[in-house]
């Protein structure tokens, strides 16, 4: 219960950033874009079809920059003061923590175990926490790893809290040896804890190599004759916290779950798993707040739960309007500089409107909001309005909306009325938990429609996020130092392309479903600028077409002897526009501590993913809208550095995180993802070669130096592909891709020259 005294300092404060200089720069770039469009309109009759195509592409780019300017206009974030929480709140609320995994091959069980251990060790009363791991792959190996991790947690959690360890994921913490100034007691405990973690890692590694012996144990009987897409519901209470209030070294509840899957039933991928987590946790612990993290995003800040509670428990007029608290997704490797910059500027910009979007991980949700409440259903004090009480608490309505389970209905009523959760034995809820995991349980209910994580898109995070904001809720953004959660990005290559395609396809699905911001901005409670922010995100896939065309236009104009850019003094519009944008984006990177090399790599990868990966989201969404095929959620392969090298020598955290000699190289395979990029590169190289040997006579009104510079710029941006033409192995472009791209490039050159 929170102390309502207004004389005490606040638990959090909103920080608004007003940088008028950056607003001027954004508007200036927008002005140059509009000037270029106006110039093309005025000279449209004097030029050919190339001019029209360029105008259409630049119109799309101008629209995107208009959206960016709107987003970045009033950035904001929150600063929390978790050290004030204990003196302000006498009884901290419970929190249910969710971890999702789906494939023990692509998501190593030891990585999932480390994420689990980091959550179990956070600085929060153990009797107020419960951790649920959803294993959509129904893997005995994953269960074994987590069961072993729960044993190690009885050593790890007390060690972390005794010495106030900062990094609470063992695989990261043990990368650095203890300082020489540490006490002998600490050094002894450190060695013991490290040895136990190494034993855990070896047991998991041995089980990975030969898991047949797992079938012999009684605890693994439920996993016999199971397949990832065909198995019954499994719910196991791995560890139950029976300690009292104030027992610091206790380990929180830990429950393993795997919902039923059958080949003939839709399971809705991660969104379906999240909704099962909500139901099981509602039956067992029913905490008012829920944290969800991906299996590779460990808790890096021990006070992360307290920081989120500072937002939810702050006494103010709008405290009850906050639906979720989102922490930025940050990474310990060198592959995520671009995302860090994107979150720092655009993320804070969206946070200053109606609140950040839900990013799928590192987010604290309020259970009542996930149960479908609208902002209009609450009184000023956060209690249900009389109309909402009649609407939601009628038993027949609840059964129809939430499913035919008396225990589930009871837990929903308690959650909506904010009743304290009685400390029941978890085993008493096992039968009901099994029931709500059946494939048919959601049939003719509102799960995935208006309740829980929303279906109809593989980007369940964005779909759910706009659904929450459309009901009038706000959200909050906290970016603490050190970062609250850390993970690893897939390296540039097939896995990155796969991930980007999945994101772009899922976002386009939301753009064309009933949650579309094009609908919401006019008839829902979402703010207009928030709708524009979502529109910017959901159109990622659509950008692939104008960007692909614009990468080919300079080459076409050189080969065809046609003008693409303005002539004379008007060329200054393009030169100034390109120069300002480059300097502006470079400043954004360098102001966050990144290098020029990092900035260039980001610019290059942005062009590559847009023209290569995002491009495939277009046919994906077209085929889905036509009912020909359905989009599929493919799990991205997760990797983790090893604490010990093969020779047994330790690697430091710096050695693991910093790029090695191969980290900057782009990886290729024979998939179609790399065909567009190779084609673009070959076309521009051919145009430059043709220009240098005089394939076309360049007369006064045709192409010239500006178009040649455009081709050079495209080649520079696709430098990883140029290097890939001369590399071998996974860093080289396969011959099959090169031959296909070369054939298409020849057709393009013949068409351009002869047209």
From Swiss-Prot:
Bilayer topology term: Multi-pass membrane protein
Keyword Nucleus applies: no
Transmembrane spans: 24-44, 51-71, 534-556, 569-589, 615-635, 674-694, 702-722, 733-753
Signal sequence, start to end: none
Localization per record: Golgi apparatus membrane
A Gene Ontology BP annotation from the UniProt entry: cellulose biosynthetic process
Active site feature: 136, 461
GO cellular component: endoplasmic reticulum; Golgi membrane
Gene3D superfamilies documented for this protein: Spore Coat Polysaccharide Biosynthesis Protein SpsA, Chain A (3.90.550.10)
A family per Pfam: Cellulose_synt
Keywords: Cell wall biogenesis/degradation, Glycosyltransferase, Golgi apparatus, Membrane, Transferase, Transmembrane, Transmembrane helix
EC identifiers of the protein: 2.4.1.-
Keyword Cell wall biogenesis/degradation among record annotations: yes
Top-level EC class: transferase
Tissue localization of expression: Expressed in young seedlings, primarily in the vascular tissue.
UniProt cross-references to SUPFAM superfamilies, sorted A to Z: Nucleotide-diphospho-sugar transferases
GO molecular function: cellulose synthase (UDP-forming) activity
Role of this protein: Thought to be a Golgi-localized beta-glycan synthase that polymerize the backbones of noncellulosic polysaccharides (hemicelluloses) of plant cell wall.
Family: Belongs to the glycosyltransferase 2 family. Plant cellulose synthase-like B subfamily.
Full protein name: Cellulose synthase-like protein B3
Organism for this UniProt entry: Arabidopsis thaliana
Organism placement in taxonomy: Eukaryota, Viridiplantae, Streptophyta, Embryophyta, Tracheophyta
Gene this chain is encoded by: CSLB3
